[in-house]
Amino acid sequence: MKRWVGWSVLTVVAVLALVALLPSWVPVSAQGAKPAKLVIAAVAGNESLGLKAVAPTYERESGIKLDIVEMPYPTLYEKLVTTFQAGAATYDLIMLDDPWMPKFGTEEWLTPLDSTYGFKRDPDIPGVIYDVGTWPPPRGPVPPSEKSKPKHLLGITVVGNVEMFMYRKDLSPAPKSWDEVLANAKKLNKPGSMAGYVVRGAATNPIVADFLPILWSFGGDVFDASWNVVIDSPASLRAVKFLVNDLKSVAPSGAENIDAADRSRLMAIGQAYQSTVWPGEVTGIVENPKVSKTIGKVGYIPMPAGPSGKGYGMMGNWLLAIPKASKNGRAGADFIVWVTSPKVQKAYAEAGGIPSRTSILTDTAMNDKNPYFAALAKSLDAVPNWRPRTDQWNAVETILGTNLNAALAGLATPEDATKKAATEIRALMKKAGY
């Protein structure tokens, strides 16, 4: 990506000399115009740890205060939508979950980073990172209303989340397939003391996040390439049955109520053998010496393969983007470049942030401290899937997650749950113009 726009040769030379000596550079102050502060809307939780950790360094070196306004996940989404609809210049930068990109991109609420600030791809950052921040999407089905729009980079990943797999490496080798996951779970499952597999089964988002990598590996999907609903296809139904029949049989009781914090806690206290996992759970709980009894015993790998012959991780990146209404776009763009630079990314990762640079994820010393980094690097290199790129995804996820949860709780059969979900999603998408 281009780091300096519209500077003189002498200025660039001077700044390059400064970079050789210091772990940062401050282009806004070099240009002579800078705001007193930048306001960043951020999600509360582990995802913002790294950002908060490097903030004092940025403030000291730039002279610009960072006002990081943290909000719970659902509150952040609602606040951003209402702010953008009002055209308010409340935030200079925002953190957005990658499934929000279709909504924000369709509504044209974000400033293109490529055409406005000259951002270009950095070879040290996996291409999928740029793809997930691009709208309309560069691969997969494109919403009907977006097909004629030019593609632009609207966000840059600051939290390199990809859903992976964790298992007790002191108890067995790494599973290569979901069949091995189930076989190992049956061998090690001891009801009341050791769960063979922890299903993250809470309704709506949690169960969908747990299920999609399984669905894809079984050859199923929510939509096909033409936006036809296929969640009730034979391959998709096999995946649903694997979740609610097979995996549930080796899961803790009450699987329909378990969320991410519950599964991480069970792994940390030694009462679970394996499950899917997000990087934030690893740093916050599973590998946290203050709460975990299993440090050094848990292995991390990309998602196991299914009947399709391939495993599919799922993107869960948090991106930094600049609202169109921001009055400090140039300073915001400079901050994005600063915080994603190699030196700052190392400090960011050391403070618990989840990086996306290959050089950081494959660094030997960093891997010694962060045992999931190698799996994350492999997961990114394998090009993980993202959730369907439609502005209707929140509603689709609610429908799918509600019906999957009902099946997991024994309130509906897998057949009835998938049929009901498919019918409701088809009606939703038809109304939305698909």
Where would I find each of the regions flagged by the language model?
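Conserved N-terminal structural module of periplasmic/extracytoplasmic solute-binding proteins
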Residues: 2-109, 115, 119-122, 256, ...
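Extracytoplasmic/periplasmic substrate-recognition and gating elements
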Residues: 56, 147, 151, 162, ...
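Paired acidic/hydrophobic, glycine-rich loop segments that form the ligand-binding mouth/hinge
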Residues: 92-95, 273-278
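Hinge/lid segment of periplasmic solute-binding proteins
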Residues: 98-164, 176, 180-182, 295-301, ...
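Short, solvent-exposed loop/beta-turn-alpha elements that line the ligand-binding surface or hinge
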Residues: 111-127, 201, 218-238, 287-293, ...
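Long, aromatic- and glycine/proline-rich binding clefts that accommodate carbohydrate-like moieties
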Residues: 128, 146, 298-302, 350-402, ...
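Extracytoplasmic/periplasmic solute-binding protein
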Residues: 143-159, 163, 180-229, 235-236, ...
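Glycine-centered hinge/linker elements that transmit conformational signals in sensory
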Residues: 184-191, 226-257, 299, 303
